[in-house]
Amino acid sequence: MHFYLQNIKINTLKFFIFVLFFSSCKKEEAAKIELFNNPVLSLDKPSNFPEFDSYNLRTNAPTLVGVEIGKKLFFDKQLSRDNTISCNSCHISSYAYGDHNSQAIGIQARVGLRNTPPIQNMIFLNTYMWDGAVIDLKDQPIIPIITHEEMDSSISEVLRKIQKEDTYIKLFKRAYPDGEITSKRILECLAQFMFTLISANSKYDKIMRNEDVSFSAEEQKGYLIFQQKCAFCHKEPLFTDQSFRNIGFPKNPNKIEEKGVARVSGEKADLYKFRVPTLRNIEVTAPYGDHGQFTSLEEVLSYLDQGVENDTNLDPYLKEKGNRIPLSKEEKKYVISFLKTLTDYTFIKNNELKIIKT
């Protein structure tokens, strides 16, 4: 009898230990679930747009917390060596994430080589930068971070700063199972935020989607002229064909550094070729050209009308047209009226920085 009771006590004790252990495990598991809660975001593709770039989505799908980390990093001056500028210093939302300087201005008022390109619809593109130096968006932030004329820092220095900040520590614990802050993840999160910067709500877009909006007579004339004389390079709906062309714009005085795509490829055939920029939100992204050669759209169109600089590798389309795109005074006015329909006021006014609670 005594042996039987002793067995019951032992078994009961084992049962309670098991219950406590199981309960503890469940609590730990629940805590982990609460800590790591980072669903993949479903980006809405505008109906009049092409498919997203599959490589970017496959290798770095945007997540709820990843995007928030990227947004915080984008506005964080710690990415620069002396903590004085952030990505947002040059990429300002009200200018379609560009700025109004001819060339980018970095720390200590250093002047960069090129005009700041706007950040919009990056998820639809397959290469980045004026010269196509980057094919994976998560590698793009490395260039401004390490460039002497821009942030003049290093990835390791940025990592050191970010790893010390309590808000980032909490956010990374929510974003990744192990909570580790790494340089790779910093770059991935920046790219995820940039993926969400989709501009597709201009007057033009609403017309293309049959949303009970129509062009004015002047805008309609401009659209027809645009289709005849501009759409060869600035293809709808992104208003770029993502090609690189030498269109005979005035050259950057810094001829030692500036070679266009040839700076990357080393090929003479690529001299002074640059990415065909998107014309979306063009109304708010002056000045124009690879180093801000033109202060207004009128200047750009007048230059194309008068005749561009001749080069051995000038784009064949321009050569066929006698090195110019002829436009009358009225045509220029109509084209500019149309280009203003590409302004997405919802996009350029969306400048709030809201970080999720940690």
Predicted regions and their residues:
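Bacterial Sec-dependent N-terminal signal peptides
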Residues: M1-K32
